[in-house]
Amino acid sequence: MTEEISTPLNYRRYQDGDHTWSDFKEDIFVGDASDKCPTYVHRTPPCQGSCPSGEDIRGYLQIVRGMERPPEDMAWQEYAFFRATDANPFPSMMGRVCPAPCEDGCNRNDVEDFVGINAVEQFIGDTAYQNGYRFAEPPTLTGKRIAVVGGGPAGLSAAYQLRRKGHASTIFEIQDQLGGMFRYGIPGYRTPRDVLDAEIERILALGDIEVRTGVRVGRDVLIATLDRDFDAVLWAIGAQQGHGLPVPGWSDTPNCVSGVRFLEAFNGGRLQVTASKVICVGGGDTSVDVVSVARRLGKIKNIREKDRAERVIGGYAAHDSAMAAVREGAEVTLTALFDREAMTATETEVDDALTEGVRVLNGVMPIGLIRNGDGRAVGLQLARCIIDEKGIPIPQEGTEFEVEADLIVSAIGQGGDLTGLEELANDKHLIEADAFYRVPGRDGHFVAGDIVRPHLLTTAIGQAAVAAQSIDEFFANEIRSRRPRVDVHHFNLLNKLNEHQLAPTPYDHTQSWGTDSGQFAVHNYEDRAAQEIIPSQRLFLGHFDYESRNQRQDRIPTGDEVLGDFDERRLNLSEQQAVAEAKRCMSCGMCFECDNCVIFCPQDAVFRVKKDRSTTGRYVDTDYDRCIGCHICADVCPTGYIDMGLGK
């Protein structure tokens, strides 16, 4: 993604050089008419299809913009919070740190620039925090209790979703506090601890979620004990074991450490300063966090042997906070195998690191350590490299060079620590999962998060929701052969009608048959959201004017200012900005009440539903006695909600 708008500012259906006629069979005409009539079809927007958590993004944007109205006794801000947290109980956290694959998928990229979904999500979460919003009262307990092993994003999300289904849980967490990667893997200036604590407390406030911290399952509690005392087990232990560099001598060199341990020592408050010259090998978000923290921590002159950074990171010591008063700037270098454009780290995070004084070397790979007589690393040997067709880096002969270092950090990947749980491990030291996040061959065992496959936080949250649903179905002895093709949280028209006391009435067989006025069914509506994602080609993009994105302000210190700067960097949108940004949403696959179909219908066949019967998704209807099948309504529908197909 880029902050710069590089696409043209106008939309053209046909481009210069187009010379192929459209298929005339798409529209079957007799004069100005056809035997096709409009029907209203709900599809999933690509933002939601691109969101690993499966959030109803279009839904909460519709609420923020004022299009979808809340119940009479609820503020729209709280209604948006409920919609956003149906899939993800951490809107404040994810609004800050999610790399937002939803924005890459946004159809508005084909107009001018994506909708700032991530920024609006942070606004929803921070508003909920400021106003003290709570989750809805959970249902009565079912009597089932699940052991959730791991209190990070996946484990907490699973406990949340399970409680909403009526199931109690006990969370076993090896650390002293809950939060996992939110707390121990990401610096506090990106995930403010007061907001994190509030979002965790909100989950626990649902009740019947027991927490046992400082407990290692496999050592303090055995798997057999969990099988005996609980109705199901969910493994959400994360991937807290960092991989070392594949160079000789790495494991027995004291000042060579993993990025996971570096960040854990910093976030735990033990690491107050780092080394004079720090190199981090990576290219992903963890490596960027390492170098950004290193620039903030700085160094101190003449550090004592027992206070060296690697001893603190290894857990053998802890720095006195007084060290912070005498620290100086450190030289920090980030190396990556790939070119800048191919780095997996979020582009803005890399930009910020450069602003803060980090040196970034792209297209290089480590080939060896340089050690002194004491066995400490004093530098890293590197070479330019190319990536072959199998994704393996190949060093280029004659391009070798050295970079001095007092601390070398590896952030090239993470794996699971399955000590005491070896019977669960696959050949990658992770836990196997099927499509339902069940552990194959272990009845009643489920898994979610990085221990399945290290990926994004939003992925862990989405997997936890699926696992919770699978646990619920396990208790009900329901067996499904497959998940939905588009496996996300969808708008549900029937739920919306129920919310506004407009649910279909019982069928009356004495009513005149053949009429569309009966209230026993939802007429002329098809829900394909679980099967289809709507592409931009199905929209009438010419409807949308160019509008600049409402961007958050990022407070990024320069290289001269970064030392000791641990204040939050990402500032929230104002309410006015959030509403304006939500209005840029094109509502792909769902009516957004623009009136185009009503205005342009030459037969006055399309009409607005009466206000006392109108809801989201039921704003317009069609009088088929008047409709001639001219398809104009479908052509001018900006959101692709109208299909010409009824009667075929």
Which residue stretches match the model-derived regions?
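Beta1/beta-strand and adjacent pyrophosphate-binding region of the FAD-binding site
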Residues: 141-154, 274-284
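Ferredoxin-type iron-sulfur electron-transfer modules and their immediate structural context
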Residues: 1-145, 193, 235-252, 260, ...
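FAD-site-proximal beta/loop scaffold in flavoenzymes
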Residues: 254-278, 284, 296, 306, ...
